[in-house]
Structure formats: structure tokens, C-alpha cells
């Protein structure tokens, strides 16, 4: 069978399975999730063996050490996959929720009901644990899914898929509800993102190049973010003792995450008091600093490299930080909206009016006051789990949890009313 026919068959099976899932009750979906978790624990040795083969091949192919690290499963990460599925089972089921009821002058009562999206295509790279996470989230939200993991994790993903299918079958749900592509042909991605008759939304998780390509070529909606160029602005009215640990955590807790601060903006009035202290923290932790002329004058040209225009635009995902001293809240908002990626941005201030204005005018999916940008996360937001973070303005925005994998439809109750 050729690739086009294979993908069409996959899509048809997913669409049929999605209709069955939409009818499944919470108890059945939870039973499947728990059975998946049990299967993963029981078959842990098989998963680790398959993963060891993937890792061996990746090392032989010269895959970057960071990618090999993401690819590698351990007993702990396998246990974490099982626990993650059990946590998803414990979350409230959004499907079928009704609300916003109101009576109209005609006598009809209308409201909204939350329903599954249908079929979700998820494209990701080296992390095999995403296979279990994505399958669990889509299932709980009543969606079928088609998963295309990185070719370097092919054996691992197939082994995890076998456990997922075992759990679905144990709960008498169609195994086509979760399908992991059984091909490493990259052309399959191009077909997956251009099947609107079978796929309702695409969620890409990976590098900027992958996401940009999918966004440009997809013929179905895409839930995505391209960059995590996050800012923290230390305002003229900031409590500097509060600002220090927040700015430290936002940059140094983890360097490679999309909610890590990449640019620090500091009001000129507090720069002399604040920058030497926070920059020493960064330097002690091995962070490379790139700053404006004022920053370099305050800290020392030998300690701070000159920042370029490109630095204000860059998500480093590394121990590198851009620093700029600015003259006002207006300038901070303007800088963030011009250079930022609409992900997560923070103001440190004790001024209520300034905080309100920052919240209102900064055009990002998460905007924070006096807290680290590292909190922009589905778990920290109480969503329990997330499929990713969206910086788009339509449908889901910010961390996308179970509700973000559903939509709403209008429902109307009447008693024989007709329109006059």
C-alpha cells in the first residue's frame, strides 16, 4: 500500500473512532487510562529494551547529546508515564459540561455544552514520553489522535503504543482511537497536516523550524507557539528584595524551557541599585550577559557583552541573558510587544495602576505580576497536564489542558416555540 492510501485509511479509522469516543462516558475513559498505566508498568522491560535500541542507533548516527538525553527512557521516566496517565484519569472530565444558561424573550432556554474537537494530529520529536501523555489527554477529552513521533524514537513509540492499545481494548474502546504512525517517511507529516476531512486540529511540539513549516503548510487549524522569548520588567516601583529571587528563578531554574526569561528590562531609576546584585547572581551561576550601553557601564564591559538587535529577538534556551535599561513603563510595554513572542511576560512592581496597565496592554498568552515566568505551565495553573502552550489568540491560549482539547456548542431547549 502506498503512503497516501495508508494515511487515508488511518484518517478514516480515526474519524470513526472519534465518534465512538464522543459517546464514551467518564468511567469508561478512566478505565482505559488506568489499564494503559498498568500495561506500561507491566511491560517496562520491553519499553526500556526498545528504547535502548533507539538510543544506540541515535548515538551511532551522531545525534546531538541533548537530543539523546530527551530520547532516553529510564525506569523513573517509565514510572512517570504510568503515573501521568493515572493523574489524567483523576482529572475532571470536561466533556458534556453545560453552562451559561439563559432564557430569551421567545421563551427558549439556551446554553453551551463542551464537546470533543474530534481527531487531533500531534507531531513531536525525540521525547517518547509524549506518546503516552498525548494519548491520555486526547482520550480523556474524548478525542481520537494520530501521533507522529520523531524517527529516532520509532521503536520506543511503537512499544508505548502497544500498551496504549492494550488499555483501550481492556475498556472496550476502539484501538484506532490512538494511532502511532508505523512509518518514518517524512512525507507522512505533509499528508497528516493536509487531511481536513479526517483531522480537526494539529498540535506540533518541537523546534521552531518544524512548527514554522507545519503552520505554513497545514490545511487544518494548528495549536502552537514558535518561540518562548519571555521578559521580566523591573519597574521604578519594584520591591527590589522581591525582584531579586524572581529574576534569578525566571532565568536560572531551567535554561531550556519555553517559559524561561530571555530578556531582563530594568527601569533606569532602580538600575544602579538592582543590576549589580542580580548580575552577580547570574555571573556566579555561569550566565553569559549581553547588555545595552548603560548595563555595560554599570556592571563592567569585561563582564557584559554588547547586545545586538538580534539579542532582543532571541530565545536562547541556554545560560545567556539580554539586559536593557529603559526609561518608562511605556517603553517596557512597547519593547515587549515589538520583540516578544507573546508567550509569558512579567512586571515586578508595587504600583497597582502600573500592574493593571501592564496586564491589559502586554499582548501575551500569560502576563504576570511579581512572579516568575516559570509558572507558565499547565501543572502550575491547576490544569493537571498540558498538551502544549499556545500563543495564538483563537481557541486555546496559554497552557492547553483538557478544556483546550474541547470546544463549545450552543444548545437550545424549547417547548414548541416557533420564530415569528
Swiss-Prot record:
Record keywords: Amino-acid biosynthesis, Cytoplasm, NADP, Oxidoreductase, Proline biosynthesis
Cited Pfam families: Aldedh
GO molecular function: glutamate-5-semialdehyde dehydrogenase activity; NADP binding
Organism: Laribacter hongkongensis (strain HLHK9)
Catalytic activity reported: L-glutamate 5-semialdehyde + phosphate + NADP(+) = L-glutamyl 5-phosphate + NADPH + H(+)
GO biological process: L-proline biosynthetic process
CDD domains: ALDH_F18-19_ProA-GPR
Annotated Gene Ontology cellular component terms: cytoplasm
Name of the protein in question: Gamma-glutamyl phosphate reductase
Subcellular location: Cytoplasm
Record's function text: Catalyzes the NADPH-dependent reduction of L-glutamate 5-phosphate into L-glutamate 5-semialdehyde and phosphate. The product spontaneously undergoes cyclization to form 1-pyrroline-5-carboxylate.
Pathway involvement of the protein, from the record: Amino-acid biosynthesis; L-proline biosynthesis; L-glutamate 5-semialdehyde from L-glutamate: step 2/2
InterPro entries, A to Z: Ald_DH/histidinol_DH, Ald_DH_C, Ald_DH_N, Aldehyde_DH_dom, Glu-5-SA_DH, GPR_dom
Amino acid at each position: 500500500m502506498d503512503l497516501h492510501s495508508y494515511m487515508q485509511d488511518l484518517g478514516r479509522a480515526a474519524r470513526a473512532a472519534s465518534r465512538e469516543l464522543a459517546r464514551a462516558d467518564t468511567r469508561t475513559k478512566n478505565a482505559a487510562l488506568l489499564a494503559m498505566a498498568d500495561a506500561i508498568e507491566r511491560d517496562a522491560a520491553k519499553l526500556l529494551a526498545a528504547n535502548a535500541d533507539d538510543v544506540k542507533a541515535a548515538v551511532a548516527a551522531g545525534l546531538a547529546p541533548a537530543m539523546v538525553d530527551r530520547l532516553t527512557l529510564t525506569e523513573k521516566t517509565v514510572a512517570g508515564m504510568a503515573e501521568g496517565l493515572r493523574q489524567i484519569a483523576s482529572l475532571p472530565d470536561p466533556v458534556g459540561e453545560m453552562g451559561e444558561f439563559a432564557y430569551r424573550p421567545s421563551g427558549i432556554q439556551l446554553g453551551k455544552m463542551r464537546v470533543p474537537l474530534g481527531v487531533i494530529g500531534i507531531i513531536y520529536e525525540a521525547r517518547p514520553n509524549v506518546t503516552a501523555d498525548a494519548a491520555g489527554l486526547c482520550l480523556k477529552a474524548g478525542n481520537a489522535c494520530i501521533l507522529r513521533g520523531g524517527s529516532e524514537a520509532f521503536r520506543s513509540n511503537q512499544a508505548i503504543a502497544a500498551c496504549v492499545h492494550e488499555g483501550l481494548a481492556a475498556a472496550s474502546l476502539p484501538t484506532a482511537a490512538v494511532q502511532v504512525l508505523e512509518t518514518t517517511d517524512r512525507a507522512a507529516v505533509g499528508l497528516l497536516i493536509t487531511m481536513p476531512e479526517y483531522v480537526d486540529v494539529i498540535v506540533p511540539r518541537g523546534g521552531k523550524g518544524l512548527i514554522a513549516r507545519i503552520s505554513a503548510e497545514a490545511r487544518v487549524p494548528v495549536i502552537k507557539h514558535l518561540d518562548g522569548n519571555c521578559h521580566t520588567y523591573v519597574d521604578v516601583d519594584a520591591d527590589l528584595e522581591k525582584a531579586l529571587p524572581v529574576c534569578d528563578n525566571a532565568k536560572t531554574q531551567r535554561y531550556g524551557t519555553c517559559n524561561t526569561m530571555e530578556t531582563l528590562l530594568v527601569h533606569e531609576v532602580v538600575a544602579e541599585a538592582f543590576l549589580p546584585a542580580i548580575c552577580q547572581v547570574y555571573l556566579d551561576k555561569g550566565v553569559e550577559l549581553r547588555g545595552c550601553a548603560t548595563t555595560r557601564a554599570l556592571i563592567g564591559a569585561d563582564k557584559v557583552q554588547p547586545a545586538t538587535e538580534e539579542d532582543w529577538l532571541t530565545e536562547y534556551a541556554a545560560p545567556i541573558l539580554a539586559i536593557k535599561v529603559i526609561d518608562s513603563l511605556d517603553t517596557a510595554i512597547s519593547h515587549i510587544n515589538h520583540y516578544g513572542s507573546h508567550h509569558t511576560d512579567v512586571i515586578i512592581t508595587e504600583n497597582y495602576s502600573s500592574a493593571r496597565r501592564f496586564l491589559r496592554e502586554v499582548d501575551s498568552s500569560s502576563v504576570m505580576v511579581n512572579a516568575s515566568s516559570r509558572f507558565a505551565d499547565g501543572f502550575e495553573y491547576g490544569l493537571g497536564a498540558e498538551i502544549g502552550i499556545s500563543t495564538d489568540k483563537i481557541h486555546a491560549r496559554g497552557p492547553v489542558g483538557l478544556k483546550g482539547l474541547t470546544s463549545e456548542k450552543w444548545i437550545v431547549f424549547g417547548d414548541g416555540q416557533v420564530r415569528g
